[in-house]
Amino acid sequence: MRCCTEYTDRAEVSLLDYTMSQVQRLYKVYRVGRSILLDHSMRGEKMNSFFHEAVEENPIIAAVKNMDDLKICCSLEDIRVVFILFGDVCSIREIVQQIKDSGKVAMVHVDLISGLSSKEIVVDFIRKNTEADGIISTKAALIKRGKELKMFTVLRYFLLDSMAYENIRQQQHAVKPDYIEVLPGVMPKVIGKVCKMSKTSIIAGGLISDKESVMAALSAGAIAVSSTNHEVWKM
């Protein structure tokens, strides 16, 4: 472990000099060491290997806000995971299907789908009527229902003040999401603190718009970054 840590620490000094493909290879070395630590710290709780393997191949997650975004991300072979941030009760099935047809993991942000309620039944609707792999939500009750339905779950959390740290700590124990997405994702020191205190893998999202932001979040300990920026998707 010490050797792996020393290697990645040296690599991080000049990560911005590497291409994204080279960074992804270095990132995998780092993830091997971190995965071992997580396996011990999660007290026997198994990590979600399917999702985890996808972000190990490419830690950049495409967050799509409209049909143009959807078309672009589906055409990018390197993108493995897609966060769906738009849609309505009539269109969400087709949106998810396009992502699945392109061979990607489809995660629906259920809070942002028009025409659906904020109650647990919305998760049942997504599970029954789409081929979505999982859900994203800021609501603990919906995350809990997603886990009951054997879906991947991402609890989205906005870091507004210092109370957020304790709230995240409580939520991870009470709800046990598979992943926690923290926003904004451009605060590496804060991301690092959350990663150290959390037994749940962290995704950094929000305002990720360039290579420097991506590298800073990953170096701080995030398992992946989510971004709506097309240039970030193509790195």
Give the residues covered by each predicted segment.
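Active-site-adjacent beta->alpha loops and helix N-cap segments on the catalytic face
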Residues: 86-99, 115-120, 137-151, 160-166, ...
